[in-house]
């Protein structure tokens, strides 16, 4: 069963109140969507960090507002400029029947097979924007490198998409380049060492 993050309303907006919430183990937040203009609140630091570690930025999660379960995106995460801890979070509440636009990571599978083929992967893109209904949005897109046996350019149009999902960017954009790996000169170095030893 998917965990549900409890979203608590916040009615006090002073800086001292925000600091108090953080000391008590909460993260100040704001939630917004089609039917919610802007709702200040706060969430459990421990529970949010657990979900954030699993889902990442733009990850799709379940949150409970006034006892009603909603689907939301982790839209923005602000961290302290020196300590690095999370100090504020934005959630975008999703409408199940309305398409959304979101950046998702691109994952390369079976990259280790390229080395055995004398090839190397040069990444050009790490994320891509996609469009689809909230229920169809994947956590990431996958490119399987098993089928690549020679140098080539992998483009966005080569990515296999889940049903109901579209890429909003130029499909001719290069995601990664598979190239011939560099040949080392170790044998020549060994020969030079032997020559030096003989001359000595």
From Swiss-Prot:
Please give the biological process terms from Gene Ontology that the record holds: translation
InterPro entries, sorted? Rbsml_bL25/Gln-tRNA_synth_N (IPR020056), Ribosomal_bL25/Gln-tRNA_synth (IPR011035), Ribosomal_bL25_b-dom (IPR020057), Ribosomal_bL25_C (IPR037121), Ribosomal_bL25_long (IPR001021), Ribosomal_L25_dom (IPR029751), Ribosomal_uL5_bac-type (IPR020930)
Query: What GO MF annotations does this protein's record show?
Result: 5S rRNA binding; structural constituent of ribosome
Cellular component GO terms, alphabetical? cytosolic large ribosomal subunit
Q: Gene3D superfamilies, alphabetically? A: Ribosomal protein L25, beta domain, Ribosomal Protein L25, Chain P
Keywords recorded for this protein, A-Z: Ribonucleoprotein, Ribosomal protein, RNA-binding, rRNA-binding
List, alphabetically, the Pfam families matched.
Answer: Ribosomal_L25p, Ribosomal_TL5_C
Q: Which residues cross the membrane?
A: none
- Could you say which protein family the record assigns here? Belongs to the bacterial ribosomal protein bL25 family. CTC subfamily.
Function, as annotated? This is one of the proteins that binds to the 5S RNA in the ribosome where it forms part of the central protuberance.
Quaternary structure, per UniProt, is: Part of the 50S ribosomal subunit; part of the 5S rRNA/L5/L18/L25 subcomplex. Contacts the 5S rRNA. Binds to the 5S rRNA independently of L5 and L18.
Entry protein name: Large ribosomal subunit protein bL25
